[in-house]
Regions:
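Short substrate-entry loop that stabilizes the transition state in hydrolases
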Residues: 110-115
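Lipolytic serine-hydrolase domain surface
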Residues: 1-81, 85-96, 116-175, 192-208, ...
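The conserved beta1-alpha1 loop
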Residues: 103-107, 181, 213
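Alpha/beta-hydrolase fold active-site loops
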Residues: 100
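Gly/Ala-rich beta-loop-alpha elbow adjacent to hydrolase catalytic centers
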Residues: 160, 180-188, 193
């Protein structure tokens, strides 16, 4: 084997309320049970052969049975930190790296390792030069355990609010982007609304909120969540929706009502929130991670983050 690395390493900060399994297998290091908030850094490698929007993984079809850093996106290390060290070092890095950061909150059916790889892929594909951070709540990482995930995102909301307070206060960034996907939107929106009630001054720390394919009841979103978000945050909020989103269509069937991210029954339009219809540009399996896997959406988010331009100007 060559001594030259054929991958790039992306360090990512994390906060999680999953149980620490202490497993030597880094893909299994944090489990599916609830725990107190923990903090740390993970390094994820992305191969030079990486294609925009992909998270390359071993494929049985290609007779790949183990991870290979020259071909696959994989976790290289996970290091826990105490809270003080975590936020102090984060602020130091942000001061050096363009004073910007994003927080990614994943959705349903996602493991800690999935979330780490996704956060690194978003960082790499968006050519984001600031501090990437992800919050991993105890999703079961299984399509069949939807209702367990629903209960756990509701439980995690309190921890998420406390983390957001520290993150907004202590990261010392000039630009903070908050990004939630799928069911993660339930946690982020509720945590933000509660936090803004308690600490309204923190809204000045937020640059933009991106709600990708929210798995939230569309009527509840329109009536209860969106107006409060617009009023309390008073910063740009972008909603990405799609009519092709299979996970949201399935969720609509489970709940009997459309979801806020599902454009199939009409696009959710709310005063003060910019809605981007991503229908028809989606190529991803299960059609649910289009915000991170479709190059046009990546280009749109990149433009949003780099320029702050609104949709009509992009």
């Amino acid at each position: 084997t060559s001594s030259k690395k054929d991958y790039i390493e992306i360090p990512v900060s994390f906060a999680t309320d999953r149980n620490d399994t202490k497993d030597d297998d880094l893909n299994e290091r944090f489990g599916t049970k609830r725990a107190d908030l923990q903090y740390g850094r993970t390094v994820v490698s992305i191969p030079y052969t990486h294609k925009l929007g992909e998270i390359e993984r071993p494929s049985y079809w290609r007779l790949e049975f183990s991870e290979d850093a020259s071909k696959h996106v994989m976790i290289q290390s996970i290091k826990k930190q105490d809270k003080e060290t975590y936020f102090n070092q984060m602020a130091e890095r942000i001061a050096k790296n363009g004073k910007s950061t994003f927080l990614f909150v994943h959705g349903y059916n996602v493991s800690f390792a999935d979330a780490a790889r996704r956060a690194a892929q978003i960082t790499f594909d968006l050519r984001f030069g600031g501090e990437p951070v992800f919050y991993s709540w105890p999703s079961q990482g299984a399509t069949t355990l939807y209702t367990v995930d629903e209960a756990n995102i509701e439980w995690a909301k309190h921890n998420m609010k406390n983390f957001l307070r520290d993150y907004l206060t202590r990261s010392k960034a000039d630009d903070i982007y908050l990004v939630a996907h799928s069911m993660g939107n339930r946690g982020l929106t509720k945590a933000l609304i509660e936090l803004m009630n308690e600490n309204p001054e923190l809204k000045d720390k937020i640059t933009e909120v991106i709600l990708a394919a929210p798995d939230i009841d569309a009527d509840v979103f329109r009536r209860d969540i969106a107006p409060k978000m617009v009023q309390k945050i008073a910063k740009p909020i972008t909603l990405y929706v799609s009519a092709d989103d299979l996970a949201l269509i399935a969720s609509r069937k489970v709940h009997g009502n459309p979801r806020a991210g599902d454009a199939g029954k009409g696009v959710v339009i709310v005063k003060g929130i910019e809605t981007i219809d991503a229908s028809g540009v989606d190529t991803s399996f299960l059609s649910h991670s289009y915000f991170a896997t479709t190059s046009t959406i990546i280009a749109d988010i990149l433009d949003l983050i780099k320029s702050g331009k609104r949709a009509t100007d992009r």
